[in-house]
Amino acid sequence: MARMVMCKKLGKELPGLTFKPFPNELGQRIYDSVSQDAWKLWLEHFKMIMNEYRLSPADPRSQEILYQQAEQFFFSEGAQLPPDYRPPRSKG
């Protein structure tokens, strides 16, 4: 049976993560209070941030930006989009 959490992002009880996503206090907070569904939303936001800011996961400064963005995404009103971000055009 899946571990259930009261998801901070989605505001309801849902299956929690099966792993601690970051090796720090923020990773523990996410593990304790973020659902798998909210994590999937984060992964899409994460890809956009990585591409728009041209970040490298191996760079300590890039990691700090990602931690700040994750903090805002999950525990604040939401993360801000990069200033020059243009959403992808839908095909059709």
From Swiss-Prot:
Coiled coil start-end: none
State the HAMAP family in the record.
Answer: Fe_traffic_YggX
Family per UniProt? Belongs to the Fe(2+)-trafficking protein family.
The keyword Iron is annotated on this UniProt entry: yes
Q: Provide a GO CC annotation, any one.
A: cytosol
Annotated Pfam families:
Iron_traffic
Q: Which GO terms describe its molecular function?
A: iron ion binding
BP-aspect Gene Ontology terms: cellular response to oxidative stress
InterPro entries to which the protein is assigned, alphabetical: Fe_traffick_prot_YggX (IPR007457), Fe_traffick_prot_YggX_sf (IPR036766)
Keywords linked to the UniProt accession = Iron
The protein's name in its UniProt record = Probable Fe(2+)-trafficking protein
UniProt xrefs under NCBIfam families: PRK05408.1 (NF003817)
Q: Does the keyword Thylakoid apply?
A: no
What function is annotated for this protein? Could be a mediator in iron transactions between iron acquisition and iron-requiring processes, such as synthesis and/or repair of Fe-S clusters in biosynthetic enzymes.
